[in-house]
Amino acid sequence: MASSVISSAAVATRTNVAQASMVAPFNGLKSAVSFPVSSKQNLDITSIASNGGRVQCMQVWPPYGKKKYETLSYLPDLTDEQLLKEIEYLLNKGWVPCLEFETEHGFVYREYHASPRYYDGRYWTMWKLPMFGCTDATQVLGELQEAKKAYPNAWIRIIGFDNVRQVQCISFIAYKPPGF
């Protein structure tokens, strides 16, 4: 046992001396020529664009004449297929879908006070009841079509409610009135 302690101490002393001379100075990035080339050409956007290319593709949200409403509101209007995917996502998470609509202001506004209050555009009218037990995204889309027919000039959003934690987990605009 004593011999193993002595040998490990000797090894530790030897590696400390060797490590100091093994570190090479940094000489910058290596050229791409020295790396092996794979036979598979990966042509997705993440492999083609460099970091600088991605920065040049970014755009700034125009602040004039456009309002930001909810999650995904900066994107073009979602198609029915895209809405179905979003609804399926919230159903797969076990959340309860619910529709809400607003006929006057689809965005947060201050009417009675400069600081946030109860009546400042964050509370919308619920369409019917939350869809407890719903497992089919097309049912939610059908309710959206009914709400659009009943209120064609209203903003309609879909929320996902977690009834265990009692919180709203997802909310996105599903329909905007014409002209918005």
From Swiss-Prot:
It is found in: Plastid, Chloroplast. The keyword Transit peptide applies. SMART domains: RuBisCO_small (SM00961). Keywords: Calvin cycle, Carbon dioxide fixation, Chloroplast, Photorespiration, Photosynthesis, Plastid, Transit peptide. One of its GO terms (cellular component) is chloroplast. It comes from the Eukaryota. GO terms for biological process: photorespiration; reductive pentose-phosphate cycle. Signal peptide: none annotated. Its main location: plastid. Residues 1-56 form a transit peptide. One of its GO terms (molecular function) is ribulose-bisphosphate carboxylase activity. PANTHER family: RIBULOSE BISPHOSPHATE CARBOXYLASE SMALL CHAIN 1, CHLOROPLASTIC, RIBULOSE BISPHOSPHATE CARBOXYLASE SMALL SUBUNIT 1A, CHLOROPLASTIC-RELATED. Belongs to the RuBisCO small chain family. Heterohexadecamer of 8 large and 8 small subunits. The basic functional RuBisCO is composed of a large chain homodimer in a 'head-to-tail' conformation. In form I RuBisCO this homodimer is arranged in a barrel-like tetramer with the small subunits forming a tetrameric 'cap' on each end of the 'barrel'. RuBisCO catalyzes two reactions: the carboxylation of D-ribulose 1,5-bisphosphate, the primary event in carbon dioxide fixation, as well as the oxidative fragmentation of the pentose substrate. Both reactions occur simultaneously and in competition at the same active site. Although the small subunit is not catalytic it is essential for maximal activity. This is Ribulose bisphosphate carboxylase small subunit, chloroplastic 1. It comes from Petunia hybrida (Petunia).
